[in-house]
Amino acid sequence: EKLISYGKSLGLDAYYINNVFQTILEDSVLNQQAMLQKNLNPEAMSETHRVAYLGGQGSYSQLACHKYFSRRPGKVIEMGCTSFDQITGKVESGQADFGLLPIENTSSGSINEVFDLLQHAQVSIVGEVTHSVEHCLLAMPGTELSHINKVFAHPQPFAQCSRFIQGLGDIQHETCDSTYHALKSAVETPNSAAIGSAQAGKNVGLEVVKSGLANQSENHSRFIVVARKPLQVSKEIPTKTSLIMATKQQAGSLAD
């Protein structure tokens, strides 16, 4: 309240002041948790971390990777992959130390392909990170919305921007293995566009035609970090436990 009162005297918005304060607190807590984990798992804190994720430069997975590993000491070696299977495969084989997998989104819900994969992959969940997703329609410089006749995207952005896509009418939609591949396809295909972040588009020479495409204004994706071996977790850190259960296909089986 003191901060808000003082901020108002300087002409600052109360909502803005509260957001900055909450961000500082969250950052402090996350740094403390990272330090506790470092002390408890010194063997996992090597000089380099090989991280496998979906897509390439500018993909949401890469941005989430930067956000999570920025709190860990050492250099991050990025390993862009073309499928979720490839990510877990690199972790299981020892080619990667960690894998980053999107598991749910506030607009499109759970990513079932990842849940199915976790039933068979020999990996352990060792962390998570939530990243804000801001979908934009991206095209080559000078391209107008009325000139676009084809849109490329990963299935998740298509689902998260379904209302916008429906509003485009008869424009063709083509799904890609990753947002990175969608962006490259838009670069190579005349009068086309892709759905991705503004930064991702900039990396490959695309410009924003329209922003704010998601069905929900607050659009976030939650990613899990997986490794071959589980990590010890400090008792001072609130944790989650993920369980996979199989039940009979009959009424009441979940309650039983």
Predicted regions and their residues:
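Domain-level signature for soluble enzymes in the chorismate/prephenate branch of the shikimate pathway
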Residues: 1-256
